[in-house]
Amino acid sequence: MRRFLVALALAAAAVPASAADDPAVAVVDGLYARFDATVKNGAGTLKDRVDAVGPTLERSFDYPAMVRLAIGAKWADFTPEQQGAITEAFRRNFVVTYANRLARAAGAKFEVTRKSEPSGSNQRVLTHVTTPDGDDSQIDFVVNADNRIQDVLLNGNVSEIAGQRTTLGPPLKAGGADGVLKFLRQRTDGMLAAKPAP
């Protein structure tokens, strides 16, 4: 349910308003606009959605910061080559995961605050999502000083990065950097190979 609600937030139609005076809000507005355009005429195939949203995700999310936070202290033990390979595998997995969620997220409504609020050294952009069946959720985007999103929070405290840390923990413990890399690649390839639901 948590992943579905996050997906709903990402697929909602953007609220037309200028966010030029708040770069953090502008990032979220641009993200929503791209997702909305992607599913406006139907979800299409997973590959279609990956191609459509990948560049916007690349501009909007700080993958190096996200994977570093998801791995935790062990990140410093990896070689630069391992860090680079894992970051790329994380990026690819993230894009495919969000494109996959997008197929299930049409029909939601949401509101974006027109300004961000401080959250430590970052800014938090609050959005409110209403699913087609009437469920309400708060989805916050944590935007860093480089105006890149580095976390997504459900109901203000359920962290996407914390979820990634939990997911990556077992392969990290069992196989270190190689275990994480293998896990991410296999999970991504599995989503791409899956047959669409009827």
Model-identified regions with their sequence ranges:
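Surface-exposed, charged secondary-structure patches
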Residues: 95-137, 184-198
